[in-house]
């Protein structure tokens, strides 16, 4: 997706565009925002139909993910079409019989660490909220990587209560303890998270690396994802998981139903 323009370059671009604009319209150059798509691909395959190992077939599916990312996403106005993607996964190897692919969204935000500020995270897609208070006790459908706030030594995280309130919590012996139960709002219909003023001093590592940004994740209401306005869709291949499992019914000519396992079609809440 390349590097963003600096302020001098943006000003020069506005100047260059001036002769071509309508008199009453002033162009504004905005940075693109990457909306990450995090996938959990679980496929069933018939071991009688292939001599390849599970790992080899998983590698083929991984290549399919990379190709789909490069061929269909990473540009403006792109759409992640779930059925198109899952069809390509099924076609990655003749032994693959089906797949369940869940979808989560991720967005990075770099906080201003010199004072208390409000900010927004716009996923641009409706978020999963099948009923009021959904999954409140376990953190709703919003998650984040860690951060620290002024005056407190605990590592903090964001979640939601399922009724539109963003919360900040820390863990005590693995139990969520809420620093704030009204840290902002979540508009499930639009995917907009509004964070109330908070003084974030430092952020935790992301994906095992030193980071200046917090990653917010959310579960969308649809598995079809659209990039709106300045959003660019991109599959997060680092946090996407791919796992193959033997189809016990196919292998046992219909007699393996007692050991056949199914995969949930809704993503689990995770900060990755």
Question: Where in the sequence are the language-model features?
Answer:
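Short beta-strands and strand-coil junctions in structured, solvent-facing domains, enriched
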Residues: 2-3, 47-51, 72, 91, ...
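Residues at beta-strand starts and edge strands
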Residues: 35-39, 99, 115-117, 210-214
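Beta-strand elements of well-folded, non-transmembrane domains
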Residues: 45-47, 125, 218-222
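Structural flexibility/helix-modulation signal
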Residues: 134-179
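Surface-exposed interaction regions enriched in Ser/Thr/Asp/Glu
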Residues: 163-164, 171-272
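An aromatic-glycine-centered, glycine-rich loop/turn in mixed alpha/beta architecture
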Residues: 29-30, 55-140
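Carbohydrate-recognition loop of C-type lectin domains
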Residues: 1-72, 76
